[in-house]
Amino acid sequence: MDFPDRRVPWSEALSLLVPLVAVIVPLARMLGTGATTMEEGNVLVVASGILDGRLPHADVSYLYAPGSVWTVAGAFSVFGTSVVVERLVGLGYRLLLLWGIHRLARRWGLSTAACATLATWAVLAPFGLIAYPWVAGLGLLAAGTTLVLDGEDRRTAAVGASLCGLAVFHQIVLAPAALLVVVPAFLSATDERRARLGTGLVAGLFPFLLHMVLVGPRAMFEGMVLDPVVRLRAGRRLPLPPDPNDSGDFFARLDDLVRGPSRFPGLDRAAQVAALFWLLLAATVILLVVAWRWRGSARSRLTTMAVVGAALVPMVLQRPSPNHLKFVGAWTAAVCVVAIAEPLGGLLGRLPGRFSVKRLGRSVRHLAPPMALAAVLGGLALLAPHHIGRFTVDAFTDRPLDGSSATVVHDGRTLPVGRGPGAKAVADEIDRLVDLVDALTRPGDRVFVGPVDLTRTNYSDTSLYFLLPDLVPASRHIEMNPGLANRPGSGLAADLAAADVLILTDRFDGWSEPNASVVPGDPAPAAVVADRFCDVGGTATWRVLTPCADPGDR
């Protein structure tokens, strides 16, 4: 019996191996970096809460489509609840994204595919491995797009459309991009292929129906649409266009303050954000024009990639922060490599004299993709040496876990805090804090983590919930978001009144952004704390409060 030869050509293996090595190099560091951000803590707490019966949107405020937390919860149920498991899920989403980019770009050659993949990874790597909904959805969208475009057989097309639907289930703002992939393919397909595409898309969107049955249509609509689009927006929106003299994002401002003046020549850090914003918009428009006038191979494929990039831009328009620019730029950078490498290869092939293709064969043309990659990443690093250059270099060159890496271990949960003397001090402080809370509570008691000033709910230490698995979050507001937790009618005051212990900090009281986050909200939650709770101890950063035994204790 004859079997088909399934050996992978060495050139294809090499084009996959190079990006894989680029992923492996910073992997140990990424798995061990601090997990103390509100965003990652929220993923950990919401996903682990699903296993305890607390559902996103119904029992916990959650601002995204629920796909990523359901996936992380599934991983927790199989492999145990840990930061490493959550980050391995995040790694899986990133590998899916890189595979999708590679397969999309391989139509223009394996070298182009490898370089486009490297461009995406270089832009995205500084964000780490958080199983963040946007990255998860983008990975599914990239994989779905390439399977829809390549899916000559019915099964591949159906799987691709299903992945596009799942991308929306992970991040609902990707719906326009997913439709821009599936609808043109549907309109140009045969009746049989249309049926497969339609079936696949419905299958990918079907988890929405299951989630709605569990949480109810109202809770689902409020969580995915009303809260993030209407209630939250005024408190998270940043000025458009970005101010080149002021980093509007709070953590970018804090980074400017902590690091001091830049050691790199060129634009100031705030101006770098503004420059990246304008560059992203310009690149998006130019890519659309290039795709429209494309004379090379696979014009429809490049057009789809450019159109998807344009559909991602609203993510930046709502909040032009460094992270949002990178989320969208990770896709755009890859398309730029393709758009530069293909015509550049043709130009190199036509060089006269000793550089001609007749003398060197096709080897000269193979230089085009690396040159395109160098042009894209080099241009970004020159334009934004701090936000792109420094963070990307640090992601690939910083040491992995060593003796100075600090972690907190409590109740079977391990939380990486960071590295260095400062991280050790923070870890020790958190350790003392959770030990105190344990001494004051019993399993099943209700705990709340938030700011001292509850009229301004801009950020919180959600990772503390993760370290206290025997306690139940007292409020559906795990994250502290302006316009949500501090709005009248949010239910936060009633939640606090029923809490058994509060963990409050003033370290985010200096939060300042050019939006409604600086405007005080409902005073009722703060009044509940003032009237009913007494300070019983804590640390320099966090105070622990429990219900007063007697009103006179105040």
Feature map (PLM): residue ranges:
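Extracytoplasmic catalytic/substrate-binding loops of multi-pass membrane glycan-assembly enzymes
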Residues: 31-46, 59-71, 81-84, 217, ...
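Transmembrane-helix signature of polytopic, membrane-embedded enzymes
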Residues: 10, 101-123, 139, 155, ...
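Aromatic- and kink-enriched transmembrane "portal" helix at the membrane-lumen/periplasm boundary
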Residues: 30-33, 69, 83, 87, ...
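Hydrophobic/aromatic-rich transmembrane helices and adjacent perimembrane loops
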Residues: 176, 311, 317-354, 359-373
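Extracytoplasmic
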Residues: 64, 173-174, 378-552
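Membrane-interface alpha helices of multi-pass inner-membrane proteins
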Residues: 121-125, 157-172, 177-183, 202-203, ...
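Membrane-lumen/periplasm interface segments of specific transmembrane helices
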Residues: 194-256, 382-389
